[in-house]
């Protein structure tokens, strides 16, 4: 491809990406199909969380927390949902229940509404409370995917009579996937004695920052999405239901070397992301250990990063495959690489690239790309979760929903054994601990990691996504 054509493709990619950025992801809101895919005396409000990296006031942090008295996800909020928030805030739980039920009939794919409905049904009765920390302000689609898993587990346990007769309440926290904000939210949660456990956080950097607070306060946190190897053994109260990057890197390395088969790779990564660096480093180790080679590295974080020039350089240096270790913040740059590459080199990627936007923007250029993800809805036909989740949400769900469901189920089992902070931690580390999740049995290693293989998926033409391309499971290596 000539330099002129590469530049044209890149320009078109940028225009497409910008055009799609404001539209949201169709899967998450409109119709059944693949779904890839935050009582008080305070007045109800549509929470507009402050942004930025400077420390926020206690009041600003409280605006990021809600069990039903604040609207954290205003996107496509129905009028009945907004009135339910007002009713919940004033303690009129019956009105809140009625309005939330009406809202869910209009938008059954709304996890915030389902969580608030279950909380309203509890009202002021005794309950066990956990928090779900999600990146509403930074990645609303990922936030809702995670909340769907939490909401489904809460809904199931409460419909079955609760935890030894006591219902489960969920507090939603919006951390914007910002490490500093996450630390402040972690402090607020740790200082609230009613919070017995936390689901979160989203990105590895955010979880790493918050984990220090949780560990100091002996509050269990289970991340469904943070994969950096830095989290392994970081603290006896820190767990995750998602496999670490080591599992993903090993699977991608084996696929490249034995199935493509190719020996030389170029890696694109974000040096400002713990997750991205972790996946890059683990893949590099795996490839060299298996007899392959990394011929070049390209950093998305560099101010002069150019997708067309980088792909051209990778090919000139002998790369036979491209590995996209992008994080959420650099997904657009990764998709520029996909466009410019134009299927010249095979593509491999981590789980952050598993989004509807990849199919939407990557289009034909993403065909044949292989990704390592923790779970896929079509890969485990024996599980009940794919069917029950589709019935509840009127759409198929992503791995983020499944692993958030698993994290919530693990906390529920911990609460069943001993409904205290220390009791939950001891239960999760017990040799006989086991919970049944969407992705199979849930057990934790002493490091807090989950010992579970990843699933490889490939992009193929299809109609499940409405974009003309789908993620399809690959058989195990």
Residues covered by each model-derived region:
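Extracytosolic ligand-binding ectodomains
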Residues: 2-477
